[in-house]
Amino acid sequence: MEAQPEAKRLFHLPVDSEHKATEFRPFSLSPPHMRAFHLAWLSLFACFFSTFSIPPLLAVIRRDLRLTDADVGNAGIASFAGAIFSRLAMGPVCDLLGPRTAIAALSLLTAPVVLSISLISSPQSFITIRFLIGFSLANFVANQFWMSSMFSGSVVGLANGVAAGWANVGSGFTQLIMPLIYTLITKFDISSSAAWRLAFLLPATFQAVTALMVLFYGQDLPDGNFERPQKPANKPKQNLLDDLFHGLKNYRGWILGLTYGYSFGVELTTDNIIAQYFYNRFDVNLQTAGAIAASFGLANCFSRPAGGLLSDEMGRRFGMRGRLWSLWVVQTVAGLLCVLLGRVDSLCGSVLVMCCFSFFVQAASGVTFGVVPFVSKRSLGVISGMTGSGGTIGAVATQLLLFSGSSKLSTETSISLMGVLMIVCTLSVALIYFPKWGGMFCGPSVGRYSSGEEEQDHSALLD
């Protein structure tokens, strides 16, 4: 209680005992909490913009490079496969170096890869480039780690949801912008082959600029950076290897990885196939297909934050049980809408169902990361990495099984089957149980709960 006046003097937002903000003001730029928020979402926005800058121009690129259906499918798989290992590694890297350095380093390393899209000349180089660009999506883990380090448990779901949601808008924004840039370049009497190559100057430059902003203007923790932490002298020193194994042994992280694989993983898969789906099935032009696909990604602006807000509100009212039930309900509804999307055979109906589906599948991702910060503060980076990797593993598995180009199933049938997989995998949420807070069907075992190592370092869940 005595530290609160000092906290008010040091910070622009009210904070808890760990100096994490207890309020979330998305239109504020005050350091360090809200400045970190804006740098986190903007840098990840640039990564999504770069990674998904290829699909809206795929019709042109495909013709120029003479890509087959198998090439396109394999490239889609490669774009997610590159993020699997990098997301797993990003959690421990954040624990070791801090989110600011991790984000800046990965973005600066992958920005030249984005620029090298202009040099590809064969299906093999196309697949390789998509694989390497996918590494940048690991910055999602650092994004969520950063927000969980800056915001208290009462608002962490909302902070995570808005930071990731606004960032994911990049996957929709690029669907609008890249065709416009390509069209604009061709108006200067530049050939189609050269125009699409020049268009990739924008995402590469944007990604590099945001990385430098994070590096020079960001701050890892409320009290300083990882290399100069102003931590209490009595805080025990953490061992990275111990924290890694501590996180990997936590079964809740594996379940959240599975469910996230069929919320965010499905979202990634849809980003990859939706423009081409409308282009082929309903005979719309490239710009129209891009605009429809953009609406799917742009919904992240409010849908994922809504999921985080729902998780926090249900946590306040019903504790952890409310968060878990929210996750199951929202993701199951998303699965049902995905099944319906594959069954609708009219353009207007498909667009309407797709918009509803986009809201629920993205909200499910937000609800998931409303639970993640409570699994283990000690191994927060590892748990975030496991969950985030689950998203890309789910995308790879779904793309490989249903949209690889070698499948005999139609795209619409594959979309419906993707919804069935969502519903089935979401059932595993019922297995998550916290001794201190309970689960979906069971209350907390306070009577036999003592002082387990894992729960000691959680932020308290609001009643």
Predicted ranges, named:
Residues 1-49:
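Cytosolic juxtamembrane N-terminal segment immediately preceding the first transmembrane helix
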Residues 52, 79-88, 138, 172, ...:
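Residue-level signature of mid-helix packing/kink "hotspots" within the transmembrane helices
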Residues 54-58, 247-305, 365:
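Extracytoplasmic gate region of multi-pass secondary transporters
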Residues 85-124:
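Conserved MFS/SLC helix-loop-helix module at the cytosolic interface between two early adjacent transmembrane helices
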Residues 101-115, 321-339:
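Structural signature of the two symmetry-related core transmembrane helices
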Residues 129-166:
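Cytoplasmic helix-loop-helix junction between adjacent transmembrane helices
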Residues 157-183, 300, 384-398:
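Glycine-rich segments within core transmembrane alpha-helices of 12-TM secondary carriers
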Residues 163-222:
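Helix-loop-helix hairpin linking two adjacent transmembrane segments in secondary transporters
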